[in-house]
Amino acid sequence: MNDQLVIVSPFTLVPPLGLFASLAQGHKLYFDGAEHYVKQTIRNRYHILSANGMQTMTINVVGQKGEKIPTKNILIDYDEPWIRLHKRALESSYRSSPFFDHYYPKVIGLFETKHANFGDLFRESFKLWTGLLKFEPDYLISDDYIELDSDYDLRSRIKSPEQFPADFHSKKYLQVFSDRFDFQPNLSILDLLFNEGPAALSVLKG
């Protein structure tokens, strides 16, 4: 293993593979719940591979009207039909994947629990992803703003998976629609789980 790096990340509900690759490769990850929420980022967005290419999925939150609010306190907006839209998109994109039937009910169960705020949903979602991976990574979740010398501070650096440091990309694996598209790196953890199942962690380790 390379020397352990220190990485600071915002709360992200359905993380890109780069986050889990960094953990699987032995690095230390700090999740900051007190940093001010930033719209249209990996905090509440994730990417899947659909029949038309990469598709962005958004977990709706209650608008803040210019206020600066800690990410952990942001409210999830269940008045918007995002759960139904995500169910439809995941079914359409991954129904033919090898492990869809095994993981899909757990993913939708997480969404349908309807945790009120971002912090609670993040904690439960991260517990689910690590549980499905059968993985106990080195991480810390903080409700206070994190100020430390880090090798990578992703809070202001990363808005989309394409911007994730290349150091933490997983190795290639067989994706749905591989007959139409080249391999799409750093999609959400769902893409890897649906396609690789129990082998997902070994893919992340590279």
Predicted regions and their residues:
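Residues lining hydrophobic/aromatic ligand-binding pockets adjacent to catalytic sites
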Residues: 1-206
